[in-house]
Every structure is written in structure tokens, then in C-alpha cells.
Amino acid sequence: MRAIFETLFDIFYLLTVLSVGIRLIRNSKGSAQFQLFGWMAVVLGAGDSFHLVPRALALCTTGLDSYAFQLGLGKWITSVTMTVFYVLLYYVWRQRYHIQGQKAVTWAVYALSAARVILCMMPQNQWLTNHSPLSWGIYRNLPFALLGLLVIVLFYRSAKEHHDTAFRWMWLTIVLSFGFYIPVVLWGDVIPVTGLLMIPKTCAYVWTVLIGYSAMKAEYKKAD
């Protein structure tokens, strides 16, 4: 039953974010903000597919242990694409609120992203085994969490300052995604049931993507 539910949920998620992302790109009408948002959604869905597709196959066939290599490789790829996702989201923020300068913030985004990717590439992560050490899960997620926190603060402040109702909950979607993700990193191997938190985490990312799509539709409708 769990295998069927997870598989159907993952299919729904991937189809949703990829289709919405493609629509954003195709219907952006040259808007850099919405083009970035579209590519952000495509990167999210494409990256997650490397992990979710093998997971669905594993759950519906011989089990997760039999797909250790594929699942580990998928997590490895996803860890990098999620970093790219937040870099793109940072540039959505710059485009939407017409941000000029602020080189220190940009350098912070690049530094945290680079640190995250470098840590993800370390062999100590043991991605391709069933025994990825918790310590390295924490190390590689520290710069990722700081990157997420930075983006949360940027969107919270800017949406409030500009009275941006379309993006007023963007910061919350990121808070929720990390709030559901961190317990899985810390206790997923010890308390397997915490893995279920990845479902609401995924829903938070769908909300993120839909915020961008709804904003595009509303702005173009208003222009017409």
C-alpha cells in the first residue's frame, strides 16, 4: 500500500513541477523573472527524478536495499540540483524586486553554494552505499541550510516592503521545506518513519512553484 501511494504521489509531483515549469518558460513573454522561475521548476523536477524514479522502482520490486547504487547516485545528483534551485530562486528575487548591487549578498550565495557542492562531492559521503554517515549528512547540509535561511530572509523582507501579496508566502514555503527536511537528515536512519516528512516537504516545493505560476497568470491578466 505504501509503495503504491508513494509511487503515485511522486508521479503527480514530478508531472506537476515539470509541466508548470515548462508552461512558465513558454508563457513568460520574455520576462526574465518568470523564465528563471520556469527553469527553477524544471531543475527541481529533473533533479528529483534521478532519486524518485529509482525509489519508485525499488518500492514496487525488490526493495530499497537492492537499489542502493541507483538511490545513492540519485541523492547525489539531487543534492546538487537543489543547490542550483536556490541560486535560481535568488536571481528570481533580484529580478522581481529590481535589486541592484548587493555584491556581498551575491558572493554569500555563491560561497554557500560552492561549499555545499564541494562537500557533496567528497567521497566520505559514501553516496553509493547503504551506509552514508550521519556526520557528512550534517556537514553538507550546513551551508545548504544557511543558503535557505538567506533566501528566506530576502523574500520575507522584500515581499513585506513592497506589499507583494503574490509572493507574501514564498518565505514560508522555504521554511516548511527545511522544517520537514532537517528531521529526515538527522533521524531518518534511526527512526525510518521520519522519512514520511519528505511528503509535506515535497508539497512545500510544489507550493513554491505554484506561487510563481499564479503570479505570472495574475500579472499578465492584469496587463490585458
Task: Enumerate the predicted regions with their spans.
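Hydrophobic transmembrane alpha-helical segments in integral membrane proteins
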Residues: 1-19
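Non-cytosolic membrane-interface motifs at loop->transmembrane helix junctions
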Residues: 3-5, 63-75, 129-142, 191-201
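Alpha-helical transmembrane segments in multipass membrane proteins, preferentially the mid-helix core
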Residues: 16-26, 87-93, 118-123, 142-168, ...
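Internal transmembrane alpha-helix with an interfacial aromatic "cap," most often the third helix
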Residues: 21-27, 50-67, 72-106, 120-122, ...
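Membrane-interface helix-boundary motifs at transmembrane edges
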Residues: 26-37, 93-105, 130-133, 156-168, ...
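Hydrophobic alpha-helical transmembrane segments of multi-pass membrane proteins
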Residues: 39-57, 114-116, 172-185
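Membrane-helix boundary elements
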Residues: 111-138, 155-159
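Terminal transmembrane helical module of multi-pass membrane proteins
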Residues: 171-217
